[in-house]
Design a protein with these regions (language model features):
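Vicinal oxygen chelate
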Residues: 5-13, 59-85, 103-108
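Conserved active-site tyrosine of GNAT-family acetyltransferases
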Residues: 18-22, 84, 112
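Active-site beta-strand termini and strand-to-loop segments that position acidic
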Residues: 44-48, 107-110, 120
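Short acidic/glycine-enriched loop/turn segments that link adjacent beta-strands
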Residues: 36-40, 98-103
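Core segments of cupin and vicinal oxygen chelate
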Residues: 2, 9-51
């Protein structure tokens, strides 16, 4: 199946801190930190479908404005929201019902990005 999105990049200012945060809340490892063209990046798992990376480099500025990336957190949302709160991060919207499309929560990551977490329950 063809996806409307093929890749995403989320800007970070401290890639080591961001890798630790996403590893903790998602319960999965990001690919090791790589470097290319003056940027440092770590990729999210890409087993099925679309993936992306967190990227540190010139011109990559974290923000709560603009495009909102929805990360697939598996079947159940609440345990991931709990890990975000335990990590001391802000939960902007703890649970938003999306009808047949599941549920989502909006958070602010360690870098200042607004990110959505998506699950079916």
């Amino acid at each position: 199946m063809r996806h409307a999105v093929s890749w995403f990049e989320m800007p970070v200012t401290d890639i080591d801190r961001a890798v630790a945060f996403y590893t903790t809340i998602l319960g999965t490892r990001l690919a090791g930190i790589a470097e290319a063209d003056g940027r440092r990046y770590a990729m999210f798992p890409a087993e099925d479908g679309v993936s992306g990376a967190i990227v540190q480099g010139e011109g990559y500025v974290p923000s709560t404005e603009g495009t909102l990336v929805f990360l697939n957190v598996g079947d159940v949302l609440q345990p991931v929201v709990d890990r975000v709160e335990a990590a001391g991060r802000q939960v902007l919207l703890p649970r938003m019902h999306m009808g047949e499309f599941g549920v989502a929560a909006f958070i602010v990551d360690t870098e200042g990005n607004k990110v959505a977490l998506h699950a079916m329950a």
